[in-house]
């Protein structure tokens, strides 16, 4: 799909290319590099990607790497919901549920897409992790 526009009506090529290259090519190169070095790692996981590309999740789990929830989708930036806290909470909870479903346990951490949490993100994560 074509990158969606960000403020200023500019296509968000940064997030689009991170997602597309990373999920199609980059992850397999990274797995090979870490396999050759014998080093385990952590890997971020967008929920949508986990549902659409389960082979990636399986490859990471087989290596014993830690998967870190990373929003619903790479282009679903939490700051879009700065004025819609109910929607942000919904995105976080939906993401964490997919994580539990595909990884088989609750998440241990979080990394917001584009490293952009809102002022509410930590409270919503605390709420989700400590119900």
Predicted regions and their residues:
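Catalytic alpha-helical scaffold of carbohydrate-active enzymes acting on polysaccharides/glycoconjugates
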Residues: 1-131
């Amino acid at each position: 799909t074509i990158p969606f526009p960000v403020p200023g009506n500019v296509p968000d090529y940064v997030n689009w290319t991170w997602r597309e290259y990373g999920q199609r090519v980059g992850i397999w190169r990274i797995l090979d590099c870490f396999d050759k070095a014998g080093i385990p790692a952590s890997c971020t996981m967008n929920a949508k990607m986990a549902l659409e590309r389960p082979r990636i999740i399986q490859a990471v789990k087989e290596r014993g790497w830690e998967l870190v929830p990373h929003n619903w989708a790479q282009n679903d930036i939490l700051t879009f919901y700065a004025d819609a806290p109910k929607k942000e909470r919904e995105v976080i909870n939906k993401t964490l549920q997919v994580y539990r479903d595909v990884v088989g346990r609750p998440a241990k951490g979080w990394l917001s897409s584009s490293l952009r949490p809102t002022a509410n993100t930590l409270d919503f994560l605390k709420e989700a992790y400590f119900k």
